[in-house]
Amino acid sequence: MKVSVLITLAVLGVMFLLTSAEERGSDQMDSPAWLKSMERIFQSEERECRWLFGGCEKDSDCCEHLGCRRAKPSWCGWDFTVGK
């Protein structure tokens, strides 16, 4: 019973958002500002180094305090150092 009420409320919320977007105009519905801001979050970035568990070929591929573990497949692992 609780699940069906939650699903109904979710559907009504989505319908409300769609109808309010239609009232504002199709240009705002196609590219809302929040969608553009979310787009920036998920864009891939070129990084200078590989993070923990990232693929590598040599120690210099990995970020600071990480070293290339040459088990197959090679990956960046903590080199047991701390500090700046």
Swiss-Prot record:
Annotated localization: Secreted
Disulfide-bond pairs as recorded: 49-63, 56-68, 62-76
GO annotations of cellular component type: extracellular region
Main location, first listed in the record: secreted
Tissue expression pattern: Expressed by the venom gland.
Keywords of this entry: Amidation, Disulfide bond, Ion channel impairing toxin, Knottin, Secreted, Signal, Toxin
Extent of the signal sequence: 1-21
Family: Belongs to the neurotoxin 10 (Hwtx-1) family. 05 (F4a) subfamily.
Stated name of the protein: U21-theraphotoxin-Cg1a 3
Organism: Chilobrachys guangxiensis (Chinese earth tiger tarantula)
